[in-house]
């Protein structure tokens, strides 16, 4: 493990790093919006949570919002991006399971968490040389 930390990261063009930040920015924007609308329990959020079979009291919604925003902030900050990506992957797995349990449409609803998770990791791969070094 120590050799990975001391190994020089592979060089990459500025365009790929920029693309990684753009992809990550889209993911961060989506997840931050999702978390923020749960902090202020709007009626559409409450209705969706009820349809999914989750508690709809404001405290539960705010807790869920914090559970989304925390890892999203970790993902946005370079030093903790890997930890944030792992936590968000776990969260998105739970979202996929909830959609699957409800019998939601497969390609548009159920697999949306998979699509978002793939973008999350692709963005991190392009913007984080240490992750590229680890995977080579």
Language model features: what each stretch is:
Residues 2-136:
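Membrane-interface extramembranous regions
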């Amino acid at each position: 493990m120590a050799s990975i930390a001391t190994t020089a990261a592979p060089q990459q063009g500025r365009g790929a790093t920029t693309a990684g930040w753009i992809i990550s920015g889209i993911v961060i924007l989506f997840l931050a919006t999702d978390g923020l609308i749960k902090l202020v329990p709007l009626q559409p959020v409450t209705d969706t949570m009820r349809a999914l079979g989750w508690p709809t009291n404001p405290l539960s919604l705010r807790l869920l919002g914090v559970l989304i925003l925390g890892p999203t902030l970790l993902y946005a900050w370079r030093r903790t991006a890997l930890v944030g990506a792992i936590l968000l992957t776990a969260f998105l797995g739970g979202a996929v399971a909830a959609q699957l349990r409800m019998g939601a449409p497969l390609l548009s609803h159920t697999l949306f968490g998979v699509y978002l998770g793939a973008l999350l990791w692709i963005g991190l791969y392009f913007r984080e040389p240490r992750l590229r070094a680890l995977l080579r």
